[in-house]
């Protein structure tokens, strides 16, 4: 949700300021950084989830 909010705010600023090349380049870099950070976060979360879930132990039948 924060990612979406940041993009909305930056888009509104872009509409107000006018479309200058420098500002568009800055907006692209911020979007890329947020996207890369989100991907890195998901890559870190998955192994933690796997380690946190208990493994099912198979009990031998008697």
UniProtKB/Swiss-Prot annotation:
Alphabetical GO biological process terms: defense response to Gram-positive bacterium; innate immune response; male-specific antibacterial humoral response
Up-regulation conditions: In response to mating.
Tissue specificity annotation: Ejaculatory duct of adult males.
Keyword match Cell division: no
UniProt entry keywords in alphabetical sequence: Antibiotic, Antimicrobial, Immunity, Innate immunity, Secreted, Signal
Compartments reported by the entry: Secreted
Top-level division of the source organism's lineage: Eukaryota
General function of this protein: Male-specific peptide with moderate activity against Gram-positive bacteria.
Protein name, UniProt field: Andropin
